[in-house]
Amino acid sequence: MSSFNLSVDVNQNGNIKNVDSLSTLDDIDDIDFAKLLEKPRPLNIDRLRSLDERSLTELTGSPQLRNADNASRAPDHADYVISPSFGRRSGFNTPRSQPGFESHPMVGEAWDALRRSMVYFRGQPVGTIAAVDNSEEKLNYDQVFVRDFVPSALAFLMNGEPDIVKNFLLKTLRLQSWEKKIDRFQLGEGVMPASFKVFHDPVRNHETLIADFGESAIGRVAPVDSGFWWIILLRAYTKSTGDSSLADMPECQKGIRLILSLCLSEGFDTFPTLLCADGCCMIDRRMGVYGYPIEIQALFFMALRCALLLLKHDGEGKEMVEQIVKRLHALSYHMRSYFWLDLKQLNDIYRYKTEEYSHTAVNKFNVIPDSLPEWVFDFMPPHGGFFIGNVSPARMDFRWFALGNCIAILSSLATPEQSTAIMDLIESRWEELVGEMPLKVCYPAIESHEWRIVTGCDPKNTRWSYHNGGSWPVLLWLLTAACIKTGRPQIARRAIEVAEARLHKDHWPEYYDGKVGRYVGKQSRKNQTWSVAGYLVAKMMLEDPSHVGMVCLEEDKQMKPVMRRSNSWTC
């Protein structure tokens, strides 16, 4: 167990007794960013290049790298402009809007709901519970989930309240060092918990944390995404506050290395992607995403790029940086080459030869053209494209997965052209992907015989419900960030207006059912925290686009692959 701790008073009744600021914030004058939204264009302010813009080649060769790293945490680029709210402790007040920005009445209600979800450990806020729904059995919805807390954390950072995020990062890091066993098998040292809860012993008047590393999850699957989200959030905290001291702590440096050591170890893999089991990410039940799911690959890519900015380049850190650089080059080429689908690529796959041998093969995964689903030919617009769900030997999952594609844009796994194509697809297929509630977690739903085979007759993942084509409001923040990065804020504004028509009235459901997301999910929890936080983050990003810098990385020009095709191509 880690030796560092946060010493505070014990909280006996769930209400905060004493919250001391963990850092001093300097007052910064208000800046009006409303004009940034007047024209749908990419944020592109010429400033000194930040570390995010530097190529991977430069990263490994520069002796001044650590100084550049620290400099990148200062406000020197459009992907990080200090938020007007940063430096103002809002306490428990709803943040005021920037001049010219009309706040929707439900913003205040959303902040109240987010405050009610806060969890305290020994007097300090350490996260937000998954849902505040007393009408249903709690199950594990009263826990703090790593992936669920990310939009909450971003909301607090954007509102100038970094303490809860810092506490969360430290507490989950401490949990990482715990011994992790499922039955008689010990998990890897770097595995981060899926969730944790605070247990209060009234006899001893003492609080402890109880973590779940997958031993209590559906299917008993370890959360592959938790570690990646932790690294991404650490970088967001560093960018937002300009404080690198947390990331520079030996414990945090070790935590990053342990997480990535699980992913960068050598084995039998012939691909740079990560092999995963079903249920290892947001889609936490059997849904046919085993293999190399786009969500994990995109998060892996973004976590690697964030780690490159956070790791110290000396000793163990330098060796890992070299591994990261090599993996990023291979991963970006693989994903952009084999996961990308547009009209031309779809037509090419339709005409694939099969049973090709040797290094000249074009159909490297031996995908049978007859296995292409009929729906994808109608779904693909003339101008548009997306990263498909999965690619493995003799198998391509052509489903659209929102989270993976949005993260691909934010991390610059997608090239600028691919990012534009993804946004074109969303606009062209608005009714299918947004409908009456943004955003479809995947499209289309699987049904009938395929549903029985793929899900094992899962009653929660029936067609157009939950993860099987359900609509998830939390994805609104990812869509908004992607829209702003690609210079298409009008798409986000339209999606937010759609959500505002129902979210508050329906009491912030976890997800919606139906082909267009018309119905509150049959097992959906009300007052779902990340639905609340996702809306708030989306609104604040539109209000101040500079906030996107917390979760946005610029393209590295060195990673753009040269596409070549061999003579075995069918003409």
Swiss-Prot record:
<dbReference type="GO" id="GO:0004564">
    <property type="term" value="F:beta-fructofuranosidase activity"/>
</dbReference>
<keyword id="KW-0597">Phosphoprotein</keyword>
<feature type="modified residue" description="Phosphoserine">
    <location>
        <position position="568"/>
    </location>
</feature>
<dbReference type="GO" id="GO:0005975">
    <property type="term" value="P:carbohydrate metabolic process"/>
</dbReference>
<feature type="modified residue" description="Phosphoserine">
    <location>
        <position position="55"/>
    </location>
</feature>
<dbReference type="Pfam" id="PF12899">
    <property type="entry name" value="Glyco_hydro_100"/>
</dbReference>
<keyword id="KW-0326">Glycosidase</keyword>
<feature type="modified residue" description="Phosphoserine">
    <location>
        <position position="85"/>
    </location>
</feature>
<dbReference type="InterPro" id="IPR024746">
    <property type="entry name" value="Glyco_hydro_100"/>
</dbReference>
<protein>
    <recommendedName>
        <fullName>Probable alkaline/neutral invertase B</fullName>
        <ecNumber>3.2.1.26</ecNumber>
    </recommendedName>
</protein>
<keyword id="KW-0119">Carbohydrate metabolism</keyword>
<dbReference type="GO" id="GO:0033926">
    <property type="term" value="F:endo-alpha-N-acetylgalactosaminidase activity"/>
</dbReference>
<comment type="function">
    <text>Invertase that cleaves sucrose into glucose and fructose.</text>
</comment>
<feature type="modified residue" description="Phosphoserine">
    <location>
        <position position="21"/>
    </location>
</feature>
<feature type="modified residue" description="Phosphoserine">
    <location>
        <position position="83"/>
    </location>
</feature>
<keyword id="KW-0378">Hydrolase</keyword>
<dbReference type="InterPro" id="IPR008928">
    <property type="entry name" value="6-hairpin_glycosidase_sf"/>
</dbReference>
<dbReference type="InterPro" id="IPR012341">
    <property type="entry name" value="6hp_glycosidase-like_sf"/>
</dbReference>
<feature type="modified residue" description="Phosphothreonine">
    <location>
        <position position="94"/>
    </location>
</feature>
<comment type="similarity">
    <text>Belongs to the glycosyl hydrolase 100 family.</text>
</comment>
